[in-house]
């Protein structure tokens, strides 16, 4: 089991009160599958991704990731940090506007003490359909689809086992969305990765997922297998 979560709770302080945003969920994801969380904005989907990515450490419950027991307030380090990567909804926000794309690639390599190798970066870009000269450009010189491809390529540099996808195509035009989704499916097979996808788009969920769960008000209220997703039973009213 790549992700094994029991009774996960997350609360945020709001003045003198606490807002309970994730309420005792159980989540189990097998190696090699794409599991998706579908739900409206604000239901807690992205909060779960942030917990699993190690970006949010104030939670309660029991969690195992990649066979390793995780404790609240634990900092992800070493192989665990390298093997769990995240692609955000807006790649522009994760790329420094005054840094060339080459620097965006060099930073994760430096963090994990991996030698900087232009051939490796060139290969990562080629896998997502981008030319090598992209590294000399700034984020604002790229289209939204190109920036998302850069974000995916940067995550692939570290050869993660688990890729967390937070609304990865919602900021893109429909035609570009399809290209990115097909690219993600291809890369998953080539690299034997596991995906945890968050989306409010039923078509994206159906296209990508082996299984999915509906999240409402901080709880997982329904689960869908591949057959149910194919029939569109997961569609929100």
Could you tell me what each predicted segment is?
Residues 118-133:
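Conserved ABC ATPase "signature" region
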């Amino acid at each position: 089991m790549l992700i094994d979560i029991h009774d996960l709770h997350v609360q945020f302080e709001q003045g003198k009160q606490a807002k309970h945003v994730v309420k005792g969920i159980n989540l189990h994801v097998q190696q090699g599958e794409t599991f998706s969380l579908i739900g409206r904005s604000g239901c807690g989907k992205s909060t779960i991704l942030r917990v699993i990515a190690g970006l949010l450490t104030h939670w309660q419950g029991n969690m195992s990731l990649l066979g390793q027991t995780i404790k609240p307030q634990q900092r992800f380090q070493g192989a665990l940090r390298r093997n769990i990567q995240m692609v955000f909804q807006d790649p522009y926000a994760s790329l420094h506007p005054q840094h060339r794309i080459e620097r965006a690639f060099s930073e994760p390599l430096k963090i994990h003490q991996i030698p900087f190798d232009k051939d490796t970066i060139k290969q990562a870009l080629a896998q997502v359909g981008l030319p090598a000269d992209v590294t000399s450009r700034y984020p604002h010189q790229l289209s939204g689809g190109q920036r998302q491809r850069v974000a995916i390529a940067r995550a692939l540099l570290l050869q993660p086992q688990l890729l967390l996808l937070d609304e990865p195509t919602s900021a893109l035009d429909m035609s570009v969305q399809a290209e990115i989704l097909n690219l993600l499916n291809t890369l998953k097979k080539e690299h034997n990765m596991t995906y945890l996808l968050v989306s409010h788009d039923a078509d994206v969920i159906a296209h990508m997922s082996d299984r999915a769960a509906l999240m409402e008000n901080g709880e997982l209220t329904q689960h869908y297998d591949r057959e149910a997703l194919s029939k569109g039973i997961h569609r929100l009213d």
